[in-house]
């Protein structure tokens, strides 16, 4: 039996800073599992690098979430339609104005 490498999460290895209001809003947004994972992946790819938005491909989202790229695209489209994510061309980010988020379609 092969031994698994011990992995320990440590702030010294990096962290993603997020406003409590944003975290609470996403918990109350009623997202599907895929939508939540895509939201978190976008958060990691943007806020995790101290950026408000960035070019993030469906393949990058797929690598982070384990979801197929076309399913990442579908989840991302719903999040953009609801105003939870913003998208201009290929650049995507999180809409911090949580009062603009629409409820379930």
Predicted features and spans:
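Winged helix-turn-helix DNA-binding recognition segment
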Residues: 5-8, 25-29, 34, 45-100
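Hydrophobic residues on short alpha-helical segments
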Residues: 37-40
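Alpha-helical structural motif
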Residues: 18, 34-35
């Amino acid at each position: 039996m092969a031994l698994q490498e011990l992995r320990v999460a440590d702030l010294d290895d990096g962290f993603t800073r997020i406003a409590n209001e944003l975290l609470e809003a996403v918990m109350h947004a009623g997202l599907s599992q895929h939508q939540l994972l895509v939201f978190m992946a976008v958060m990691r790819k943007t806020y995790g690098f101290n950026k408000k938005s960035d070019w993030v491909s469906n393949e990058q989202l797929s690598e982070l979430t384990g979801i197929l790229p076309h399913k990442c695209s579908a989840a991302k489209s719903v999040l953009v339609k609801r105003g939870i994510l913003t998208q201009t061309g290929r650049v995507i980010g999180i809409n911090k104005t949580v009062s603009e988020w629409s409820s379930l379609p």
